Amino acid sequence: VESDGEHKDTFDLKGRALMPLIDAARILSLSKGIKNVANTISRYSKLAELEPQNAPVYEACADAFAELLKFRTEEGLKNENDGRYLNLSELSKLDKVKLKNDFQPINDIQEVIKNKFQLTYFT
């Protein structure tokens, strides 16, 4: 939740949830030489094909990304803006649980990246 500024007390959905998933998909796709795949969900699908040992993580990331995009779209339509900032106090209890659950795949994909690129010195 943003602590100050214009978006105080809102959650930066793009910066704190979507971008980590987007960036992870890009990094991993580049490392595998995946080309001509232009969106995040397709990148995770291709990664799942190429790395069956990590397929559950990639599939969970694709699902979380789709759910987060849904939150952003609904927020944008409701407030006639880009939906980047989510007012958590307006979410139903179920939506809060869904949002919270969408962060586990982010943690999991970050672990995959740390292991794949041996980034243990940065933790």
What label would you give each PLM region?
Residues V1-T123:
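Conserved nucleotidyltransferase catalytic core and NTase-mimicking acidic/glycine-rich helix/loop elements
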